[in-house]
Amino acid sequence: MAIDENKQKALAAALGQIEKQFGKGSIMRLGEDRSMDVETISTGSLSLDIALGAGGLPMGRIVEIYGPESSGKTTLTLQVIAAAQREGKTCAFIDAEHALDPIYAKKLGVDIDNLLCSQPDTGEQALEICDALTRSGAVDVIIVDSVAALTPKAEIEGEIGDSHMGLAARMMSQAMRKLAGNLKNANTLLIFINQIRMKIGVMFGNPETTTGGNALKFYASVRLDIRRIGAVKDGDVVVGSETRVKVVKNKIAAPFKQAEFQILYGEGININGELVDLGVKHKLIEKAGAWYSYNGDKIGQGKANASNYLKENPAIAAELDKKLREMLLNGGNGEQPVAAATAEFADGADETNEEF
């Protein structure tokens, strides 16, 4: 229904007054906002980039990555840092767990000489550092490892055994309110790593929950559940982990998709193995028996040899990566290489019993 002329004049006057008082762009028609096309940073995993629907993690937003111990949470965030640094972006790592290994980070491709790192004493200090870096407008990616290690000052100064009900949840809730707008204005990606706890007395449904209350769940644009589902072996020697990531929440594309990839010890995500698997699935790589061929040329017998060929020929790997991204991310007709999660997972994934 068309708005009558008087209402249009009144609306135009109101919009003019708002823009005069709060600045241009403070209010706009949703269809006119071209900035809705969100800039993203690759996760280092092609299948996860595709599962996210936009080609990576969104800039200017909050992301939560959670899972059990040794599931690959920190590795995934270090791969994000490496990808961001390759694009010339500035990154910071807030190491609240005091457990960051610079040698391992360097092996994953992180430029440790240009990585800002802080090991804060309290949770409040960590979040204030995040806010200061964000307001500077000069930092593109901030990692907080982890929410569970963001200990409130009152708890640190108190005695072991003292009750501090809801302190961490209140601290996180206040920080989210303060950070969300600044992150959008600075176009900074803030990633929180989180741990899993078990809810006591749950008879039905998922007993797992994450630490830090409900605020992070609400403010996060993307939530990723990462799990180790098996071992990668070279003969009898375990050389890595089979990893599955489920997109529990996604505000920039369809949620509840999942991706599977390998994390090799000392190397990180096996991107070349992903290229082989996705290339075969989408008929860019031919597979005859145990042999793999690309553009008519044999590239190896067995997946491991084909992956090594791509590792030794980065130009071919980059070409294959580009073709797959164009096919699967830019409106191509290729079949989506990610499976929808079950309804049971979707219903139970966001449950929590912590105070807001």
Curated annotation (Swiss-Prot):
It is found in: Cytoplasm. Pfam families: RecA, RecA_C. Gene3D superfamilies: P-loop containing nucleotide triphosphate hydrolases. Transmembrane segments: none annotated. One of its GO terms (biological process) is DNA recombination. Keywords: ATP-binding, Cytoplasm, DNA damage, DNA recombination, DNA repair, DNA-binding, Nucleotide-binding, SOS response. Its main location: cytoplasm. One of its GO terms (cellular component) is cytoplasm. Can catalyze the hydrolysis of ATP in the presence of single-stranded DNA, the ATP-dependent uptake of single-stranded DNA by duplex DNA, and the ATP-dependent hybridization of homologous single-stranded DNAs. It interacts with LexA causing its activation and leading to its autocatalytic cleavage. Belongs to the RecA family. This is Protein RecA. It comes from Yersinia pestis. The lineage of its organism: Bacteria, Pseudomonadati, Pseudomonadota, Gammaproteobacteria, Enterobacterales. The gene is recA.
